[in-house]
Regions:
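Exported/extracytosolic protein signature
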Residues: 1-289
């Protein structure tokens, strides 16, 4: 929005001399007929996750505005002086609300480079408020280190409003653990009376340590559990019921601090691609079948 600045001068005679004095500087903000704001339903973002944005457009004039168009740059930023990457992917659909009432879907167009999405609202009546609600998803250009941000800018234009009215919105990366578990058994086949190894691979794709981890399983048929290993180191601090086959690690009386380290998240300085190497622990439980 433009600012109008103004300063007055005053001349008068005093003691045979002409004196000129200046007033203070007065200023007002010149607001155009359109205003825009943007927010998200989420307070932070995670990698490979959905974000719901809302963009609010108001026609503050006394006349209808035609061909109102909203654009979102999807957080596009420079990775080098000449190269840009876009950390958000538009997934839609986009819904339109007029003065609080849902009026249906709104046409969304993603440009060929996928660096921005455009919404065609059309006519906005005088004094009317339009809200567009839509979904995006973080992709492999979204920075994942703790404290990273995505700054996406929404803008609006209309007939007679050639200079876009903009609103930048910042989301900060969440501090989180994201652990998955994979189980396997070896050998296969197993000979009756042989040692069966239950292998659990724990992978943390988040940027924070997963603490107070507890591994539970119900082993059937019930084996004679011999040992527990974490990354090859024997740690027989488990609980096991020979009646139910229920296995618990660490056990209830264990003081072992079982945690899965945070992922290593890096960004290629040339391509901008973000890579994730999960923090990993491998737990092996040996039992005689």
């Amino acid at each position: 929005m433009a600012t109008i600045n103004n300063q007055a001068t005053l001349t008068f005679s005093s003691g045979g001399s002409t004196v000129e004095v200046a007033s203070n500087k007065a200023s007002v903000t010149l607001q155009g007929p359109l205003t825009i704001s943007k927010r998200s339903l989420e307070t932070s973002y995670q990698l490979d996750n959905t974000i719901v944005y809302t963009v609010e457009v108001k026609n503050t004039s006394t006349a209808s505005l035609q061909n109102v168009t909203v654009k979102d740059d999807l957080g596009t930023y420079n990775i080098t002086a000449t190269a840009k990457v876009t950390p958000l992917t538009y997934v839609g659909p986009a819904q339109r609300f007029e003065n609080g009432t849902h009026v249906g879907a709104v046409t969304a167009t993603v440009d060929s480079t996928k660096t921005f999405v455009t919404f065609s609202i059309g006519t906005v009546a005088a004094g009317s408020t339009e809200i567009i609600l839509y979904k995006v998803k973080t992709n492999n250009y979204a920075k994942g280190a703790t404290g990273s941000t995505i700054i996406s800018t929404a803008s609006v234009t209309a007939d007679g409003v050639s200079t876009p009215v903009t609103f930048p919105y910042t989301l900060t990366d969440d501090n989180y653990a994201d652990v998955v578990i994979e189980k396997s058994m070896t050998p296969d086949p197993i000979v009756d009376g042989g040692v069966l190894s239950y292998v659990f691979v724990l992978k943390n794709y988040g940027n924070a340590i997963a603490s107070d981890v507890v591994l539970k399983d119900k082993l059937s048929p019930i084996p004679a559990v011999q040992h527990t290993y974490v990354d090859g180191t024997q740690r027989d601090e488990h609980d096991f019921s020979t009646t139910t086959g229920e296995y618990l690690f660490p056990g209830l009386t264990s003081t072992y601090d079982f945690a899965v380290p945070a992922a290593t998240i890096t960004q290629d300085a040339t391509t901008g691609v973000v890579s994730i190497v999960p923090g990993t622990h491998i737990v092996r439980v040996d039992g005689i079948i």
